[in-house]
């Protein structure tokens, strides 16, 4: 790692503004409440996402502690149900989706050379309505009947007023609706920003891969989140106003499953695609090479976006109410463009001069973990196998390998990669490596064994099991490693706090030395409107061409940079 990029002749060193002295108390809080600055909102999204990530992680530790040995330990069945319901919801709707908007809010306008997002006030509205929704869901714990306890999938009839009469369920539905509105607002903003605010010369096929992935994910959001919000309000209508939308005579549980999973499976790609984009930004910088197969990577992203709408019912194989061959085939098919992306990433690293700074280490953790999750997904796509392991811990393990592998590993890669751009200071490399290895070992120790305990027949969402079932040893291994995974956030939190105050100051535009996209062509942190001047944009690597002009003609001659 170098905090000092190679100097060029006539290169004017950017100056870092000095602190302006002590501000009045409450100034920061008022600034956050009223801001429409995409950079501050992006950091607020990221910080709050990680706060909710830690809350969801504590719930997970309580779940794992309860499953350490047979018999109920310290949670009742109802409390256990509430915890796994809120754990899943928090991780998906309060961490996974908002952290996408955190990175996209901060980085995307910089990458396309825009001064801000298209709708700054809508941006602020989306952030605050999302946080209100999350608080509403968690407020269920304060009600007499406790929080929602019907699972994060809200299956009916478990979620109707007869089986879940408490107010906590109503709070949960309100929270889902509010977070849905915030997500839709952010998606509209990103699509409009990309289509209308690109800098001169920034054609669609000169955009960074991260921007393409945010664009496709935002389009998916507009297609699925209104459906989730409407379907959830339908459940509320049944619960509170005596509606009969989900009566068994009208389709009941199967109708809800179709509506929910038509949202639920594309949502997995809303979570995955932006993080594919992050690793697609990290790998070329630390492999010292252009992205291999840029056009193919873009079309793989578009293919995933289209196919994501055609696989939802693979969650419903065991209902007997769907056409198994079609959904099995489509599930196998959607793995093809994802495999193409792996070849692009590996091709970029192939014969590159790889530098193992912390962002690249996290990216390799992503590649390994997500590959495992993808392979178990191929297994689950086969109905004969799925019949036996559906609703077991095998599915839990697969789900965590795909989502933790993408969202968490790539989020950490993004934080370590862009922290100097956001704050003007470097994170500590040694603490970053410690953080990575504790997380990597803790994660795989927790979830690898869950494949085996699921294959032995342990059902998910049960608070208890018998000693004679033979699940005890594997559950104990999983629980011990889950606490190691919980401990892994300590070096991360310490690293962020320490580096924000005392980290090595970045004095150049590009502390990594080989950045490609436009965010590396402005100061760290950027000025209020992002750029004092924009370089000429002739390819998808404008910052690299700005810093290494003598390389441009040679690379074009050797056809390393495409003419888009």
UniProtKB/Swiss-Prot annotation:
Subcellular location: Cell membrane
Cofactor names: Cu(2+); heme
Sites where the protein binds Fe(II)-heme a: 87, 400
Cited function: Cytochrome c oxidase is the component of the respiratory chain that catalyzes the reduction of oxygen to water. Subunits 1-3 form the functional core of the enzyme complex. CO I is the catalytic subunit of the enzyme. Electrons originating in cytochrome c are transferred via the copper A center of subunit 2 and heme A of subunit 1 to the bimetallic center formed by heme A3 and copper B.
Mode of membrane association: Multi-pass membrane protein
Claim: Nuclease is one of the keywords in the record: no
Co-factor binding comment: Binds 1 copper B ion per subunit. Binds 2 heme groups per subunit.
Pathway field: Energy metabolism; oxidative phosphorylation
Intrachain disulfide bonds: none
Residue sites binding Cu cation per the record: 265, 269, 314-315
Principal place of residence: membrane
Keywords, comma-separated and alphabetical: Cell membrane, Copper, Electron transport, Heme, Iron, Membrane, Metal-binding, Respiratory chain, Translocase, Transmembrane, Transmembrane helix, Transport
Residue segments, region Disordered: 1-23
CDD domains assigned to the protein according to its UniProt record, in alphabetical order: Ubiquinol_Oxidase_I
Gene responsible for this protein: ctaD
Family named by the database record: Belongs to the heme-copper respiratory oxidase family.
Record field: catalytic activity: 4 Fe(II)-[cytochrome c] + O2 + 8 H(+)(in) = 4 Fe(III)-[cytochrome c] + 2 H2O + 4 H(+)(out)
GO biological-process terms attached to the record: electron transport coupled proton transport; oxidative phosphorylation; respiratory electron transport chain
Enzymatic class: translocase
InterPro entries, alphabetized: Cyt_c_oxase-like_su1_dom, Cyt_c_oxase-like_su1_sf, Cyt_C_Oxase_1, Cyt_c_Oxase_su1_BS, Cyt_c_oxidase_su1_bac
Keyword presence, Cell membrane: yes
Gene3D superfamilies per UniProt: Cytochrome c oxidase-like, subunit I domain
Protein name: Cytochrome c oxidase subunit 1
